[in-house]
């Protein structure tokens, strides 16, 4: 039987019978050295084989787990709607909203609660309880525990800032003022105006000043495909705010779910209206939620349903227009505050030349001016850089909806 070619050759001892004892001793010593060397090679190969065996064992275990996963039937998501006292449960399957009465195992009967999210099999038996649904849906929400925007970062919105502080900051920081006067603070604040005028910055700055968590959600995220999903997300939004209070809820693009109702009978429009009804319901009970305030923003104030604007919901309507020349000068000074700007740059002249620019566009103007300076390998921003940036933004505005061409459509 031949040996593996990967094994080292076995050393052999050839001793001449006619050799002297000293020569025999030297031969034995050389043979011993050869044996030790071969043993080292064999030990190294053994270590490699054992390492490879361990890798193969891990691969086998992984494949076995994958095989078990492939053979395991998928589970469906459902919500517990009711828990009768006979050990059963009424569950509603997600997607088709089918309600089923199913028996619970003794292990789950004592721990399950109404509203829990569960996994069920094809026979509608509850297999396990899932994590809090609010956590699973938090990906649709932007939660900022401590916004970095301050009042100093906002320019040209002194009147709007004062109104927002009165309606949001004072009820959280100085509630005794309202108790002393005997009035209730506004239930909600609606910011309306063209895009890029600083509506989100206003909300973040107030959250920073009050040390409140900032929970932002776009209204379009509340528009869901399946029946009941949007309403459930609205409930999750307010439940998350309760967990993180003091908190400020900011709903951007609220017109996506609060547009004027029509006679349309399509399922999509009906679902949007159900979502709006859930939002109104949550706001009607808002005064019992403690240190939670709500702010919404829209670019299309003219599209909002009258129900969302009635007293007790959004009590304070604040228009955030494009900045005037003085406000534009202040905004430019803020955004260029950290830039190395040449002394020859006059922000008042720039403000006069940027009529109808929004705050966001002025921020882009400062950034683009800095980019032109970098392009010319300079560490100082000149007036010509701002002029080049202006021309660039205007040119982009001719082909995109983001240029300095916003109409004043807020009536």
UniProtKB/Swiss-Prot annotation:
Location of the protein in the cell: Cytoplasm
InterPro entries recorded: 26S_Proteasome_ATPase, AAA+_ATPase, AAA_lid_3, ATPase_AAA_core, ATPase_AAA_CS, NA-bd_OB-fold, Nucleotidase_PAN, P-loop_NTPase
Sorted UniProt keywords: ATP-binding, Chaperone, Coiled coil, Cytoplasm, Nucleotide-binding, Proteasome
Stretches that traverse the bilayer: none
Keyword Protein biosynthesis recorded: no
Disulphide-bonded residues: none
GO biological process, one term: protein unfolding
PROSITE patterns the UniProt entry points to: AAA
UniProt family annotation: Belongs to the AAA ATPase family.
Subunit structure, interactors included: Homohexamer. The hexameric complex has a two-ring architecture resembling a top hat that caps the 20S proteasome core at one or both ends. Upon ATP-binding, the C-terminus of PAN interacts with the alpha-rings of the proteasome core by binding to the intersubunit pockets.
Notes on the domains: Consists of three main regions, an N-terminal coiled-coil domain that may assist in substrate recognition, an interdomain involved in PAN hexamerization, and a C-terminal ATPase domain of the AAA type.
Function: ATPase which is responsible for recognizing, binding, unfolding and translocation of substrate proteins into the archaeal 20S proteasome core particle. Is essential for opening the gate of the 20S proteasome via an interaction with its C-terminus, thereby allowing substrate entry and access to the site of proteolysis. Thus, the C-termini of the proteasomal ATPase function like a 'key in a lock' to induce gate opening and therefore regulate proteolysis.
Name of the protein described by the UniProt record: Proteasome-activating nucleotidase 2
């Amino acid at each position: 039987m031949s040996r593996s070619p990967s094994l080292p050759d076995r050393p052999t001892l050839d001793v001449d019978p006619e050799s002297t004892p000293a020569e025999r001793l030297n031969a034995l010593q050389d043979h011993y050295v050869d044996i030790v060397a071969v043993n080292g090679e064999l030990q190294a190969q053994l270590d490699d084989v054992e390492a490879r065996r361990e890798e193969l064992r891990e691969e086998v275990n992984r494949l076995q787990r994958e095989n078990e996963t492939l053979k395991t039937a998928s589970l469906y998501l459902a919500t517990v709607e009711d828990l009768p006292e006979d050990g059963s449960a009424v569950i509603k399957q997600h997607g088709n909203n089918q309600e089923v009465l199913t028996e619970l195992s003794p292990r789950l009967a004592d721990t399950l609660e109404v509203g829990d999210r569960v996994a069920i099999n094809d026979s509608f038996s509850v297999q396990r309880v899932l994590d809090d649904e609010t956590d699973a849906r938090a990906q649709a929400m932007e939660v900022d525990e401590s916004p970095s925007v301050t009042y100093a970062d906002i320019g040209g919105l002194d009147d709007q800032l004062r109104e927002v502080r009165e309606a949001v900051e004072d009820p959280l920081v100085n509630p005794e003022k309202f108790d002393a006067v005997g009035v209730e603070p506004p239930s909600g604040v609606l910011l309306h105006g063209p895009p890029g005028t600083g509506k989100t910055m206003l909300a973040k700055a107030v959250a920073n000043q009050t040390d409140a968590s900032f929970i932002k959600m776009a209204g379009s995220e509340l528009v869901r495909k399946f029946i009941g999903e949007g309403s459930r997300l609205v409930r999750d939004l307010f439940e998350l705010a309760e967990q993180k209070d003091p908190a400020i809820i900011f709903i951007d693009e609220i017109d996506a779910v609060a547009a004027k109702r029509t006679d349309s009978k399509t399922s999509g429009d009906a679902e949007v209206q159900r979502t709006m009804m859930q939002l109104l319901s949550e706001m009607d009970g808002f005064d019992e939620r403690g240190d939670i305030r709500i702010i919404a923003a829209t670019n299309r104030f003219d599209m909002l349903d009258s129900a969302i604007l009635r007293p007790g919901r959004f009590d304070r309507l604040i228009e955030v227009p494009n900045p005037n020349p003085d406000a534009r000068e202040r905004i430019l000074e803020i955004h260029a505050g950290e830039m190395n700007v040449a002394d020859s740059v006059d922000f008042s002249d720039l403000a006069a030349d940027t009529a109808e620019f929004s705050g966001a566009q002025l921020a882009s103007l400062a950034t683009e001016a800095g980019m032109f300076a970098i392009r010319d390998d300079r560490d100082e921003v000149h007036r010509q850089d701002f002029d080049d940036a202006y021309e660039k933004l205007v040119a982009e505005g001719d082909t995109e909806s983001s240029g300095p061409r916003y109409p004043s459509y807020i009536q």
